[in-house]
Amino acid sequence: MDEVDKIIMHQLHQVDATIEPTDELSDFTPEQVVRAVSGCLAEIRPDLQLPRTLPGGAMAQRFGVASSLAQGCKDSGYRGDIGYQTFLYPNAVELRRLLMFLIEQLPRERQGTEDGASKSQTLSHRQLLERKIRKELAQQLKTPWVPQFARSVGNRKLLGCSSLGIEFRPNINLNIPSANPEERSKEQQQYLDQQAPNLFQQTSSTSTDLIASVLHKNELDRWGQILPDSTLIFVSSEDPAPPLIPTVKPPASAEKEEEPSPIQELSDQVQELRVQCENLLAERKAHAVAIAALKQRETKAREEISRIQPTLKLHERTSLVLADSEENLAKLEALLKSTQSKRLTLTQQWQDYRKPLLESLEKLKTAKEAQEVQGIRNSIEQLEQELLAKTQQHNELNATLRSASQSLAPRKEYTRRIHEFIGNIRKQRADIYKVLDDTRQLQKQLNVVGAQLQRQFNYTDDLLFQSAKHDLHAKRAYKLLAQLHANCNELVECVSLTGNVTKQIRELEVQIDGEKLKNVLTSLQQITGDIQKFEQHIQELQEQIRAVEQTNAGS
């Protein structure tokens, strides 16, 4: 079992690197068992909140931690015998069985999820934005769609009764353009595409409904020519919406002439509007060109002004100076002399103030250079010490690696041994199946022979019974046959009892071997020590209670 224990230790070290490796599982302490099992359960079921260490204080806490881990193993599907004793008094056989089960239950994609988590931490802002957009769209697609007529549903109450109030009032002045684009001019089409409100915008208010407005518009188009004028006036009593295309009133002279057809009148109006629109567009272009030219001239003028202003200011100052030249020259000479003397004074003051500062600066530079040199020397010494320590550690690790490579079998050796174990198991399974087949064949043969013997016995018994009525020798032979049959039955019973006893003996031997492997003596010693700790704790509590009672009695 040494190879199995090494494989288990290797898997546990991958799960939790803080687990101290041991040569065998029998050397595991209760603290190591708790850490290993809790680490495996944390990988299998991350939702479980289990303690990772075994407290070293009161025994009640240790029992609680062990019981919670045992319950977690049972919830994970472990069907073996497990309890707090498995963790507080570990047994190599039971512990090996438990750890093998937990290692088999470890998720295979654990490494993949770690890589995925590291990749998710390096996502760009664009990828995060795309992920957020996908999440928002998926959430919006899951929300139910509410029709337009049900979005303004209110709950009305009247005289103790409640009902849903849904408004279906139409928009009387609904403007629906024609479906044929050839009937519209270019300007009308541009207006409809860019500025005209659509059906949803015209019925967006809560007082009108889209379906009712469309139906009302269809009825008006259908029956508008048939209804009387009074009805149409009543229908259009509300405030009319502005039409999409303004109408043009005909001149007064045209009214006196013969009234043209409606189509001709509309075409004339459209033609007139088109001419007006073209004229307005031409005027607009001309005005735009003029405005651009004026803006360009304005820009040039501003640039010229900004360029001339410095020269103008200089000329103004020069003219002021030349107005009284002698007096201004005397003032300038006096100002120049005072400025020179002031400059000399400031230069002398600056030199007097600068000299000690330069000396202190040189001293500080020298001190800083010396400090830097000393720091470099200290860092060099520290690096040399670290280099020696790293070299020594490197040599120790090399020695450890050589010893480990010599003492531990390589991975290929483990794989080869595992394949050998699997081959032996398959061979044993084949042998077991062969023994079972032989047992079945033998059982069939025994059943056949038993049936033949039973038939022979019945036939012989019938013949001898018929002959015993007339022959004394046949009567004696019949008695001997009955005695032989009874003796044979006793022999069969003895053989069956012997087989059962042998089977029970083998089961007891296996159970004895299992109990020997459990180290019952060591477990009993640990339990005895824990009981003594409990007794000491109980005595301490009793003494504390007596002290409190005496204090209360004295007071």
Swiss-Prot record:
The UniProt record lists the keyword Phosphoprotein: no
GO BP terms: positive regulation of ubiquitin-dependent protein catabolic process
Keywords: Coiled coil
Coiled-coil positions: 263-406, 500-555
Pfam families, sorted: CCDC22_CC (PF05667), CCDC22_N (PF21674)
InterPro entries: CCDC22, CCDC22_CC, CCDC22_N
GO molecular function per UniProt: cullin family protein binding
UniProt similarity note: Belongs to the CCDC22 family.
The name this protein goes by in its record: Coiled-coil domain-containing protein 22 homolog
